[in-house]
From Swiss-Prot:
Record-listed ATP binding positions: G433, D434, V435, G436, S437, G438, K439, T440
Positions of the Helicase C-terminal domain: 600-765
InterPro entries linked to this entry: ATP-dep_DNA_helicase_RecG, DEAD/DEAH_box_helicase_dom, Helicase_ATP-bd, Helicase_C-like, NA-bd_OB-fold, P-loop_NTPase, RecG/Mfd, RecG_dom3_C
Organism classification: Bacteria, Bacillati, Cyanobacteriota, Cyanophyceae, Synechococcales
Catalysis performed (reactions): Couples ATP hydrolysis with the unwinding of duplex DNA by translocating in the 3'-5' direction; ATP + H2O = ADP + phosphate + H(+)
Keywords: ATP-binding, DNA damage, DNA recombination, DNA repair, DNA-binding, Helicase, Hydrolase, Isomerase, Nucleotide-binding
Protein name per Swiss-Prot or TrEMBL: ATP-dependent DNA helicase RecG
Similarity comment text for this entry: Belongs to the helicase family. RecG subfamily.
Organism per entry: Synechocystis sp. (strain ATCC 27184 / PCC 6803 / Kazusa)
Amino acid sequence: MQCSLVEVSVSVDWPRLQKALTVEVERGFQNLQGKQHRFGDFLCLSFGSPPPPGSSPGDRQKWREFAQRFAQYDQLEEAERKSLVASTRRFLHQLRRSLESPPRDSVPKKDLLAQVNRPQVSEPRYPKSGQIELHTPLATVVSQSQHQTKLLKNLGLATVEDLLFYFPRDYLDYAQQVTIAELTAGETVTIVGRVVNCTCFTSPKNQNLNILQIQLRDQTGRIKLSRFYAGKRFAHRGWQEKIKKLYPPQAVVAASGLVKSSKFGLTLDNPEIEVLDRHSPSIDSFKVGRVLPVYPLTEGITADFLRKLVLACQTAIAKLSDPLPQEIREKYELIDLQTAIAQIHFPENTEKLSLARRRLVFDEFFYLQLGFLQRRYEQKQQQQSAIFTPHGELLEKFSDLLPFRLTQAQQRVVNEILQDLNKPSPMNRLVQGDVGSGKTVVGVFAILAALQGGYQAALMAPTEVLAEQHYQKLVSWFNLLYLPVELLTGSTKTAKRREIHAQLSTGQLPLLVGTHALIQETVNFQRLGLVVIDEQHRFGVQQRAKLLAKGNAPHVLSMTATPIPRTLALTLHGDLEVSQIDELPPGRQPIHTSVITAKERPQMYELIRREVAQGRQVYIIFPAIEESEKLDIKAAVEEHKYLTEKIFPNFNIGLLHGRLKSAEKEAALTAFREKQTEIIVSTTVIEVGVDVPNATVMVIENAERFGLSQLHQLRGRVGRGSHQSYCLLVTNSKSNDARQRLGVMEQSQDGFFIAEMDLRLRGPGEFLGTKQSGLPDFALASLVEDQEVLLLAREAAETMMVEDPNLEAHPDLKIKLVQRYEKLLGGEILT
């Protein structure tokens, strides 16, 4: 789902939002189904867009919080829904009124920024080591052991500047304390009291669960707090005694958390507990009465020690230079860097913390986007590619022979590609298209432009199944154009392989489709002008680079059927031009999608029998090919045997999984395509590329094991013909999170909406797969919460590249860009 700032600025439909809220109230908070989305999802998406321009930082924060709260709407009890809807209506009313007619006594934005320009920071009470500079070693600032110095270096903290840019991961708001007597269930609070007693023990009911219990008292009463530690290592007696010693009798403790009611009275839900002062007879402490930072720690470095160190380094903040140009700071209402660093560590209040965080998040995004754009600019300056005309006989013939008209979205993307190919700098464009949107035909226009210019093209796919699918489709088109095309995979026979190599090197073969086999040293093109990479995220950087090296700065077109939200695309592929095919060909029927449990299997089997009896075909998908007791995942191999012998003995059932030999895979797919088998049991090998219009049922077992985007890809294997299709998501999971995610699939067929919800519900790491996600190493920025800031930073970076592409007028920014860009990417090039 694409969302630009221009669109957002005019798309906050206040009456529609209020009407949705009113109807939800009138219908008893049932999470009503609208034309496209359920009420909760509609509100989640509405608040997921950037806040209206002119909103205060506080209102921006509340706007983002509402997005997160409505993401959980389906799980809320009626009373909780009622409370959320009421608070939302109040917030929207107040926000709209403040935007349309700001109160006279409100502080103007610029005045508010001016107020935090020089924050008052408490002076450290620790000995100073002379004049503190940014390059001063931390070992000379505060007294510390050699072991502590080593531990700090392990955290990447060697100098004062390192520490100033080591940001807190959270905050404890000791400024807003309540007494024990004032506790109210449902509120998040902080209490301060003295330890009466402390125990740590292993639960008698669960040997893997260990419980820390602390009884606190203040002048108004007593409370018992519990923290839980899961894992056998916490059951060790030595560890338990060590933890108890942290909370000796009379130690002053601050505890922060959600107040909940239990059978023993009020308590805090698994609270954050902070020892303030173990020896002082009073509760006076430099920590109480302010918002305290909580830093990522390592064993041997305490929170107290790190805070003292940060306080001692505060005087060096004045030495920081701000490389961000003043005109950018003014345009985007950003506070200066010195203020932001001071307030991020020891904020005076939440408003100033919000301003500080916004500035530093902007910096992270700005340096990343500027780095991407600079890299693209330098590549274009250094490389010269062939220029392909956007017109010609081949392109016209292909347009005429197509049995359908391109959608408006397809035509728009084709035009963007042909414009790129008509320039001397190499194209580097990513085409995103929803399932069935017609990416392949768009790619063919690019291929034909290269061929009619006298160059060769290569199309690389991640699997043999997908490569074969592309090859078959291209052959059907290229035969009509009298153009040869060949397929090269790991299964290609030696004789055929040699023939292909010879034809490539002489230029006789204009187009080669294949898998990783294309990057072998023996594959040599005479004149490679275009590389098309399908499902490009499946290939590593080195694999893509090897293929590009087979030509002289060839144009590159990447394609993916896995929609990526715009913020994620900017973060991963900021140096690419991104096109979206956000329209499906006419005539596609919505796929009827249902989440079912094991109890409903008889009805599912009956649906399959009915569809097969009408001549249709069925996919049954499993997440693994071996039985796994740990995850309780049904194996495709075992289930194939069970279905064949017990459930559908009269049907022909095929089997497809990743461990079959290539010939066996192709045989299974061919049998399914040619209707020799009515049902195919498969793992996710079937996920992309397989096109069987006669298939109308997709059954996905253990659906909770898949990401939403992957489920959407699998569902896209049906619904390709004129008959009604069905997708059945089978799960036995009792998890509310799993049920909520699968509910999104029932409600929407829009891949971009599903990708956006997947990102919100699972976060970018889970969305991409944490092992090779390629995500930049952000210290503060969140791709879910900070989408608005990312878009502003991209806009600022694009403006900078237009006005000063070599940064000659901004030398400080140029130096800082190299440091920050490399740090964000971990020294690696992503694309």
